[in-house]
Amino acid sequence: MQANVQAITEAGTSRFVTVKDGDTEFRIHCNDTGAGAETVVMLHGSGPGATGWANFNRNVEPLVAAGYRVLLVDCPGWGKSDPVVNAGSRSELNGRVLKGVLDELDIERVHILGNSMGGHSAVAFALANPQRVGKLVLMGGGTGGPSLYAPMPTEGIKLLNGLYREPSIENLKRMMNVFVYDASSLTDDLMQARLDNMLARRDHLENFVKSLAANPKQFTDYGSRLGEITAPTLVIWGRDDRFVPMDVGLRLIAGIPNAQMHIFNRCGHWAQWEHAKAFNRMVVDFLGN
């Protein structure tokens, strides 16, 4: 199925949804586009200045063209969504908030693409709401826990945490230089836009640091529960990921019964951006078959 796709912009797809998590009310920002019968949700990672649009702007149009409604969600504590200091499981908080967003929008069942933290959050949602998940695509994330490939926290995570504490263009460049395999693709304009996003919400930066102090293990290790996931799952990883080592992806396909894995060479932690064309073809094919 192919749909006519007009120019899709961040501003033209922006909307807000109010959800409750226990006694707490969150105003959640989303980008919502496409009119397909099936919905694809995209969940971003935990980097400073991350948003649904910043993470996935190279991936929206191909999915809309393939006939899907696409929903990018800014998790609490990122982008235009409300701030939060989180002392529990960030994965499960995001999963609960996603359920609230889908309930408010009257969307019963979704496919979920999750990058890094978004992968952890997708797994949390799938475990809590198995009947509401079609398929999962997990990139550079899906569970917390140990790695045999690299000591934890990894080089990239140390740089990410340092950037939260001292947000500057120099620290941003240090992090982004190990975030992707080929840093020459990171233009000055892209770097400045990311820095501007960060500095526009200093409350998010400060709250992330406070959250880590309250609970250093923000992301749950779901290793013992992966066998409960019934959704067909595509795990995508960069061979050169210096944030979340590749053996975390191997743990996912070892645990999830109906899972497959694709590994991109010359790819860091941002497969959907670094290898966008191949990634988009792969995801459209996986969701459609």
From Swiss-Prot:
Q: Does the keyword Hydrolase apply?
A: yes
Which superkingdom is the protein from? Bacteria
Enzyme class, spelled out: hydrolase
Query: According to the UniProt record, which cysteines are disulfide-bonded?
Result: none
Tell me the pathway. Aromatic compound metabolism; 3-phenylpropanoate degradation
GO molecular function list: 2-hydroxy-6-oxonona-2,4,7-trienedioate hydrolase activity; 2-hydroxy-6-oxonona-2,4-dienedioate hydrolase activity; protein homodimerization activity
Residues marked Catalytic role in ketonization of the dienol substrate (substrate destabilization) (site): R194
Enzyme Commission number(s) from the entry? 3.7.1.14
Q: Site feature Transition state stabilizer: at which residues?
A: S116
Which biological process annotations from GO are given for this protein? 3-phenylpropionate catabolic process
A GO cellular component entry from the record: cytoplasm
Reply yes or no: does the keyword Hydrolase apply.
yes
Report keywords, A-Z. Answer: Aromatic hydrocarbons catabolism, Hydrolase
Active-site residue list: H269
Matching entries from Pfam families are given as: Abhydrolase_1
InterPro entries given in the database record:
AB_hydrolase_1 (IPR000073), AB_hydrolase_fold (IPR029058), Epox_hydrolase-like (IPR000639), MhpC_alpha/beta_hydrolase (IPR023791)
The chemistry this enzyme catalyses reads: (2Z,4E)-2-hydroxy-6-oxonona-2,4-dienedioate + H2O = (2Z)-2-hydroxypenta-2,4-dienoate + succinate + H(+); (2Z,4E,7E)-2-hydroxy-6-oxonona-2,4,7-trienedioate + H2O = (2Z)-2-hydroxypenta-2,4-dienoate + fumarate + H(+)
Q: Which HAMAP family match?
A: MhpC
Q: Which family does it belong to?
A: Belongs to the AB hydrolase superfamily. MhpC family.
Function comment? Catalyzes the cleavage of the C5-C6 bond of 2-hydroxy-6-oxononadienedioate and 2-hydroxy-6-oxononatrienedioate, a dienol ring fission product of the bacterial meta-cleavage pathway for degradation of phenylpropionic acid.
**How does this polypeptide assemble, per the annotation?**
Homodimer.
Name the record gives this protein: 2-hydroxy-6-oxononadienedioate/2-hydroxy-6-oxononatrienedioate hydrolase
According to the entry, what is the taxonomic lineage of the organism? Answer: Bacteria, Pseudomonadati, Pseudomonadota, Betaproteobacteria, Burkholderiales
